[in-house]
């Protein structure tokens, strides 16, 4: 167990735990939350000393950015007790020679072990899974935790939509702040970008870009993770980490913010009994509303295809 760092006379009311926080994505989540002073942060990782070191490094940024958040790290889950939100970034990437089923089962076993500890120490928390394959891992956490569906929320659509917004802004040479875009469906090849509902300062992009350019943007969005992996040699971490942090901020500040997230559906969008990326309202209670958009026939067909692909993954882990 790494060293603890106590603050003098300062008590934060919020606590966020990042499991797998010594890794790139987890450390980015932890740093963002601490630097914004959203909560105290606990980094839990099987790499005990690394977790303590990452926590100390982030803690030492706090005087520079003007944050009084406490950041501690280690392998002991007891530090995470009574967390408001637990972000789970634990998981292994697919390695050469590893089948999809092998990857699923390895990460399922990791999620099982993590979920048991999270439920033990923070039975009232909201869990935000980040590990891939995202929607299947959400299903595992939901079933294993016994939590209501409002309190298990997967990070996927925020990242995919951010990528789409980036590519639209680059194409039109406009501020990304003017760009709004939604990507629904599973976090993978079958994701469903919705250009019809994507806008720049309220103007539909269908009025600003040709179909060919829009199709190219949608394809680049779907390939966004692979593009970075090809360039860097490993998975992205800054954008995924900030995406999870945005969700945590919406929850802790009770923002009632509408974001695309992986949610357990009970008939919405014609999907029942599984996780899928849809627009949700995030607030203090987690998912406070699932927003149902009227989809065109081709959009619904694409979403159905995406749901079917996610179900295939879920069936592998028998959840």
Predicted regions and their residues:
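Conserved glycine-rich cofactor-binding loop
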Residues: 22
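Rossmann-like NAD(P)(H) cofactor-binding subdomain of soluble oxidoreductases
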Residues: 99-165
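Rossmann-like NAD(P)-binding element
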Residues: 63-125
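C-terminal substrate-binding/catalytic lobe of Rossmann-fold NAD(P)-dependent dehydrogenases
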Residues: 145-151, 159-319
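Hydrophobic Val/Ile/Leu positions in short beta-strands of Rossmann-like dinucleotide-binding domains
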Residues: 18-19, 43
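N-terminal Rossmann-fold NAD(P) dinucleotide-binding loop
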Residues: 26-27
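Short, Lys/Arg-enriched N-terminal segments with co-localized hydrophobic residues
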Residues: 1-11
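Conserved N-terminal Rossmann-fold NAD(P) cofactor-binding segment
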Residues: 13, 40, 44-83, 311-319
């Amino acid at each position: 167990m790494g060293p603890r760092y106590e603050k003098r006379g300062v008590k934060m009311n919020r606590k966020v735990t990042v499991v797998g926080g010594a890794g790139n994505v987890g450390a980015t989540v932890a740093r963002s939350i601490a630097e914004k002073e959203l909560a105290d942060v606990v980094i839990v990782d099987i790499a005990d000393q690394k977790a303590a070191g990452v926590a100390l490094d982030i803690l030492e940024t706090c005087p520079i950015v003007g944050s009084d958040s406490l950041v501690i790290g280690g392998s002991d889950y007891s530090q995470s007790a009574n967390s408001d939100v637990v972000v789970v970034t634990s998981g292994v990437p697919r390695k050469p020679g590893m089948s999809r089923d092998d990857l699923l089962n390895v990460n399922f076993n990791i999620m099982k072990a993590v979920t048991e500890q999270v439920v033990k120490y923070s039975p009232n928390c909201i869990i935000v899974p980040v590990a891939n394959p995202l929607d299947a891992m959400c299903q595992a956490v939901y079933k294993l935790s016994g939590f209501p569906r409002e309190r298990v929320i997967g990070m996927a659509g925020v990242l995919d939509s951010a990528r789409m917004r980036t590519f639209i802004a680059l194409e039109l040479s406009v501020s990304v702040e003017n760009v709004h875009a939604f990507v629904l469906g599973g976090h993978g090849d079958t994701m469903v970008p919705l250009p019809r509902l994507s806008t720049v300062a309220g103007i539909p992009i269908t009025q600003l870009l040709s179909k060919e350019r829009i199709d190219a943007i949608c394809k680049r969005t779907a390939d966004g993770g692979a593009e970075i992996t090809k360039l860097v040699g490993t998975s992205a971490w800054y954008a995924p980490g900030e995406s999870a942090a945005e969700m945590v901020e919406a929850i802790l500040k009770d923002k009632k913010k509408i974001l695309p997230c992986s949610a357990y559906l009970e008939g919405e969008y014609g999907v029942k009994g599984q996780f899928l990326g849809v627009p949700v309202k995030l607030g203090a209670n987690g998912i406070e509303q699932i927003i149902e958009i009227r989809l065109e026939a081709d959009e619904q067909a694409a979403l159905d295809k995406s749901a079917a692909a996610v179900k295939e993954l879920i069936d592998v882990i028998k959840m």
